[in-house]
Amino acid sequence: MICTTIQNRTLEEIMNLLESSEPRIQMAEIRLDRCPLSIEEIEYLFSSSDTPLVATCRVVDDGNGTWEEAEEKLTAAVEAGAAFLDLEIEAPKEIGKRLRRACTEYGTTMIRSSHFFAGTPSDDVLRNTVEKCRKFGGEIVKIAAMAKSGEDVARVLALYSSIASTNSAAETQRPVELVAFSMGEIGKVSRLDCLKLGSPFTYAALNENEAAAPGQWCYSEMLTAVYGGRKPLHCNSPLNMPASKSFAQRAIIAAALAEGESRLGGYSPCGDNEAAIEVAKALGAKVLIESEGGSLQVGALRQAQRPTNPVASMVGELCRTTGSATGSTLIIEGIGSSANIPEKINVGESGLLTRLMIPLAAALGNGNQIEIDGIGTLPTRPLKGASEIMAGFGTVLRPLNPAPEVHVPLTVQGPLLPGKTSISGKGGSQLISGLLMALPLLPGDSTLHIHDPKSIPYMFITADVLRRFGIKIGSEMEGGEDFLETQDWSLCTGITFKIKGGQKYSPAAFDIEGDWSAAANFLVAGALFGDVKLTGLDTTSLQADISIMDILMEAGASLSQIDDGPQDGITNDGSSRNEATDAASNKTSDNEDAPEANAPQGHRGLITAQKAPLRAFDTDLNNCPDLFPIVSILAAFCHGRSNIQGFKRLASKESDRGTAILNMLTQMGVSASASGDTLTIDGESVESRLLNGHLLKGGEYTSSHDHRMAMALTVASWCADSPIIIDDTTCVAKSFPAFLDTYAKLKR
């Protein structure tokens, strides 16, 4: 990253520079000691800009102002949202303590800095200064020393080896980052070399006449030196994200089971959604798609004589017919209690749809054998634990092709019996979601206890969709003291669902929210290689993959969101949120009151991700395993060692995704390994890779016919030494047919 120093500018001039300058400023240091800004103007500046800003107010260097005046300005910047605060190590201790507390409270990264304008001190003084800056709150330590010889430069740059050793010894502490370079003409090259050695950013002047210190490069010169001809990703208009297939598939099946007309707005076609429509039609529902071009009845999608990628073909056909890939409304005329499941249903390539339909087939099949089949990679993906779980409800699964684990094609033979049952959630949430949809249809009440739950958010997505269709389900989460204090779902040890029998699905009308799984690829691309703005996303979503926001923030990304406000009557404080939110607060909800047909929606708005200095991170993806491919790419560009838990969850996705990720990273030249449930990745910043010649290796890659792998490879291609050629990109049609066209709007 390149941090441009802005000084001697008014608020209006600074805002114009941040919003309109060409080339675009990546990151800026605002010299509050030199810019004539009032406290109100400081608050406006640091609260309004999406560009990562460093608040700096020098007292030692210039001798202007007092420490008390500097504290007032810096505090205002931090409270307004400054990404970084730079405080000289010479600041009075009490002021340092107060500013450190403010940084912790408001999420600002503290830089403690020391400048040696008279010359470069001894090695001991340099190392002791680094340690002092670290001791007094420096998450980033900045050392700048005037160089009088090449030896001076070498000694300053040697600090990077010293800080690496210190970080390795302090295993329980967050690693401290170092920005160390030499000043003066002799030290000019060190301002570039520091990026090679792991500095999160370097400083540059706005132009050749405004250097803040001797030897400072101008921004345009530094851009060329670091990036060459590579242009950042950028799109002038926000990109609209497709409908969440997690919500859409559940809602389509629920609408088919409701008696009457349901309207699902914001629909966008993809392979899994179209498979759900075909199942809904097989149950007897009538389905129409209403778009700007009018309405049309959805015809059957033939299984015979499909081309190499049947999912891409059928979705492409639908997109051509409707003339729109997003923003349509599904009108589903459900058949309610007269649902008559056919002897054979095809679930496409959808693992979720398979597991939803197994319990529903048992509940609706009147004791008959119902065959469930699929296409693409689905017949190769085992349904681990499904036979044992369903046997507990009196249901028998029989695979048609003998194998150690149950696969489709298979037959399901009921009955599905109500009652009290405890099952393991280690295998995931999808079959549990199917049970939540089927058990309300039975004559008796059921209590379903899930121990060792995984993918918890998806269970509550199901509960949310069911609530919208009039189904009553109570829930209570369990956990130890850590869970009760933090409400961190990864600490939840059990969930109990209480399900009343004899219920009927009621028709509903609501908009399907945008897909955070798809959005994750664009947010990571923006955080790494430029900037991106997205719309159509619910910022209070139950989707597990909204966790990408937390992961990016942990890595240091620059994110902002502007909510359009509550949709369809939801309150600003979220108080009309559903039982899933109650469960997240460790409450029990029996949902005694039937929901309104038009269920309230969440907050929609504009999400922005912009390039920022990134650091290694630790995260647990057990509840959101679909993020693994793109989070792995993120980690490859975050300086340091990242640890990602949940690796064991990847074996039975559209590919053996864990193996596919390791193979991809190894081929790219990224150091990665898996041990137990943890994937470890040694990352290097984009700038370090460019300057050290450590670009990702281009060439021919396989997506393993996995839509999420294809998307991750597409994002990674920006920083490859030659084009990344993906053997199968049509697989993106499974979840986001327009992905490549949408991604192409991010101009380089």
Short names for language-model regions:
Residues 8-21, 66-75, 122-130:
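Short, acidic/polar
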Residues 8, 32-36, 59-61, 89-91, ...:
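Active-site-proximal loop/turn and secondary-structure-junction residues that shape catalytic pockets
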Residues 221-304, 309-582, 586-748:
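Short, structured segments at the rim of ligand-binding sites
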Residues 18-22, 39-50, 76-79, 97-106, ...:
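Acidic (Asp/Glu)-rich catalytic clusters
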Residues 5-7, 27-35, 56-58, 66, ...:
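Catalytic beta/alpha-barrel core
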Residues 4, 28-31, 84-87, 140-146, ...:
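Short catalytic-loop micro-motif centered on adjacent basic/acidic residues
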Residues 1-64:
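Conserved N-terminal beta1-alpha1 strand-loop-helix module at the mouth
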Residues 91-223:
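Catalytic alpha/beta core domains of metabolic enzymes, predominantly
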